[in-house]
Amino acid sequence: MRRSPSFQISTKNSAKPTTSIDLTNHLSARGGLFYQDIDTGTTASIKAKNDPNLLAATYDHSISADTDLNIDLQSLITSELNSLYPLTLNQETSNKSANTTKFIDERGGKDKHFFVFTSAGKLVFSQWENENHAMGLTGIIHTVMNYFNINDNTAMRQFTMYGKDGIMTRFVFLDKNHIKLMVQCNNNYESTAQLQQQLDLVYSYIISSVSQRNLNKLMLKRSNFDLQHYLTDLDQQLLKSLCESLATQPKLTWFANSLECLPMSPKKRNAINSILSTTYLDFNISNHNGQILYTLVTSLDMRLISILRPSNHTLHTMDLQILFEVVRAQLTDLLLDKVLWFPICFQKFNDNGFLYALIKVLPNNTIMMVISSQKNAFDILNEFVRRIEDKMIDDNTCNNLELQLLDWHKKFPYINHFIYKMKRTVQIYTPSQPTNEMLQFYYHLKNLCEDDKGTNLNKSSVAMLKWKNDATPGLLSGVYWATEKFELYILLNDINLSNQSILKSAKLLIQHIREIESYLFISRGVTF
């Protein structure tokens, strides 16, 4: 079953919060990266090369596979890739330092390109404009991946290449049996595990449209099946939009593998919870039991307001991220007074079957998302949404939901930006959406405390980075604090504080967030 919406909706664009912090001074001049481990007090400093475009890093997560290739395969890759992409395969060292790479890509173009192809090497999707070149590259990569599977019986995760200018390009892979995914990446701040997680998100989107069961049937029936032309135009459009966002405007929820909630007063959130609960109970009494599996209420920018779910089931974060992307991509051009109805397969929930989603924008600028297992449940779900809409209109508490919290800069003048993640609920809070440059700093902080599989090295750890800028006297400091209960990322700009003072500010911030948790997060939602 392929996604083909029956109805359409639209809404006005909502302004997304932005930050006024200017970090460009720290990115344009030659500098060095200082790593400090607060727990141990050790400090390491690496000076950048004389190239003003380079900013040094102290660690490298690249995994080079070229030493395992035989001479013929090396020759094939080098000659063929040079005709497609001006790079040479490094055959001398497998741990070349990331110091020779650009810390932040200043060329203005995308530093990531995503590719999807079948187990037979047939191209499904590419961000390259020249499809012939993309097909040639995927054919080569298909050969390389098969080489490792046959000779080493191991899945290839990544290989690294270096251009004549010393810039590193990584090719990271994810093998999903019938589907192979690859990302060509020119940055050094995302680890292999993080890039593979992005590939898994792309794969989850494909499964959301096709389902694993249907994909298996198609590929087993004909191994060289053309999946590219099986996907609808809408599928291709949404897949392109997702990959473009991953490459140029990555979302904070992807970075933190979490969901973001709308800050609001507990009274307003409880009012919406009560409406969902009473309406659902009314439907059960009316013999509609089992028709409604999940109900989500979000803001127009996909921040969670409330959720209705079974007491023994929760939807995986990645499944919800895919659902939000499908809705987000169609939100701008659709009509407000109509609804969207489409099938969707949640890979992490049940990758063999479809659920059915009804989406509607309500007058108070919230989005209702109702999910059912029944293909013919549209009328029932539509009536369910109508009743909720009527109750929200009658209840003034359900208007003007977002709560404007205090000015964080006044309470914490040294903190320019932060991200707080509550692990139990897999939800995050940030006072404003980080810029791409900020996310790159956060990636560097996170990588210090994770292994090559993306797992935290310790149950509890605190790490600090300081980026020195020779053009100005200040330092840009970053703190990453991870425990079993939370993760905290902080950026502090142009200050010269001691580690103890910075850590004290972090503790005060955590204490304040815990005092207002009921405003920031959904603790449980409505269960049945």
Swiss-Prot record:
Pfam families: Fuz_longin_1, Fuz_longin_2, Fuz_longin_3. It comes from the Eukaryota. One of its GO terms (cellular component) is Mon1-Ccz1 complex. It is found in: Endosome, Multivesicular body membrane; Prevacuolar compartment membrane; Vacuole membrane. Coiled coil: none annotated. The keyword Membrane applies. Its main location: membrane. The keyword Membrane applies. Keywords: Autophagy, Endosome, Membrane, Protein transport, Transport, Vacuole. InterPro entries: FUZ/MON1/HPS1_longin_1 (IPR043972), FUZ/MON1/HPS1_longin_2 (IPR043971), FUZ/MON1/HPS1_longin_3 (IPR043970), Mon1 (IPR004353). GO terms for biological process: autophagy; protein targeting to vacuole; vesicle-mediated transport. It is a peripheral membrane protein. In complex with CCZ1, is required for multiple vacuole delivery pathways including the cytoplasm to vacuole transport (Cvt), autophagy, pexophagy and endocytosis. The MON1-CCZ1 complex acts at the fusion of vesicles with the vacuole, through its regulation of the SNARE complex during the coordinated priming and docking stages of fusion, and particularly at the stage of tethering/docking. Belongs to the MON1/SAND family. This is Vacuolar fusion protein MON1. It comes from Kluyveromyces lactis (strain ATCC 8585 / CBS 2359 / DSM 70799 / NBRC 1267 / NRRL Y-1140 / WM37) (Yeast). The lineage of its organism: Eukaryota, Fungi, Dikarya, Ascomycota, Saccharomycotina.
